[in-house]
Regions:
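N-terminal accessory regions of nucleic-acid-interacting proteins
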Residues: 1-11, 15-19
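Metal-dependent phosphoesterase core characteristic of DEDDh/y 3'-5' exonuclease domains
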Residues: 2-5, 31-36, 40-73, 92-149
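A short alpha/beta connector and helix-capping loop motif
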Residues: 19-37
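Alpha-helix initiation/capping motif
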Residues: 27, 77-80, 141
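Metal-dependent phosphoesterase signature
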Residues: 66-88
Length: 149
């Protein structure tokens, strides 16, 4: 059996230029992933690898100005990037079989699930933990969101 890994995942996504132009069928879809970034940690939380790829958007090809300002990702950064199915397959291969995904906040996993469904892909994935929620509950002793800063 392969060694266990924690995959600390950070996604960036584009949104429609106008909320009224968001895709509504087969479900409301307003967050198209344009970057997957991750660190792999071993069982002792030592960094053992990193992964980063831009993703060429299919559904929202024009970059939302607010997204550009927040992420500093420009349209030209995405022009030669793989589309989501290839990028996600590469990411999952990099993750390996014996891992869990960790995020900081409640948004990344639902956005990832929506993108898998929009691309007609299998939405099965490793176990997932929202570290922000765990930190708030266990360390801060409340459910308020905490910034990493």
């Amino acid at each position: 059996m392969a060694d266990f890994s924690y995959i600390v995942l950070d996604l960036e996504w584009n949104q429609p230029l106008n909320p009224d132009s968001a895709i509504r069928e087969p479900f409301f879809f307003d967050s198209e992933i344009i970057e997957i970034g991750a660190l792999r940690l071993d069982e002792r939380f030592r960094e053992t690898g990193s992964f980063k790829t831009f993703i060429r958007p299919r559904f929202y090809p024009h970059m939302n100005g607010d997204v550009v300002q927040l992420t500093k990702i420009r349209a030209q950064d995405l022009e030669k990037a793989p589309e989501f199915p290839r990028a996600y397959a590469d990411f999952m291969e990099w993750c390996g079989e014996n891992c869990c995904l960790c995020t900081w906040g409640p948004d990344d996993i639902p956005v990832l699930m929506d993108n898998l469904l929009m691309h007609g892909m299998d939405a099965e994935m490793p176990c997932c933990y929202d570290l922000q929620r765990i930190f708030g509950h266990e360390i801060m002793r409340d459910d308020r969101q905490c910034s990493l800063e």
